[in-house]
Amino acid sequence: MAHPIQWKVIAMYDSNLDNIWHVEIKFVEDDTHTHATVRAQLRDGQAMTTHGDAYRNPNDSSQPMVGEEIAAARALIALGTELLQAASARIEQVTHRPVHLQG
């Protein structure tokens, strides 16, 4: 049976400590699958949502924390990729040149 788990993880600050980004990770799990949803609320009011999954081999022992770590890591990597793409687009709007940021 799937059960949601809510876990608030990060509050990131800029150099002036004035602006806060809220990043929330929610989990839904069953016997062999963990799904993580990451939602980041940015300082400009924009929200980004990404997802990550982890699957356990049915022959392996159940270790829910491991599934959560893997699913969360995959969702956070996806969030990082989206943030880099958004930053690239903002830079391109100003410079009118292609930008390729790497993680």
List each model region and its residues.
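Short, intrinsically disordered/low-complexity patches at protein termini
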Residues: 59-60, 72-74, 86, 95-97
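C-terminal binding/interaction regions
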Residues: 2-35, 84-103
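Flexible, active-site-adjacent loop/turn segments at secondary-structure boundaries
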Residues: 61-64, 68, 89
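Short, well-ordered alpha-helical segments
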Residues: 65-81
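Generic helix-packing signal
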Residues: 54-56, 75, 79, 91
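Generic preference for well-ordered secondary structure
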Residues: 22, 55-56, 67, 99
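A short, structured beta-strand/loop element
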Residues: 33-64
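Short, structured coil/loop segments at alpha-helix boundaries
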Residues: 1-2, 40-45, 76-79
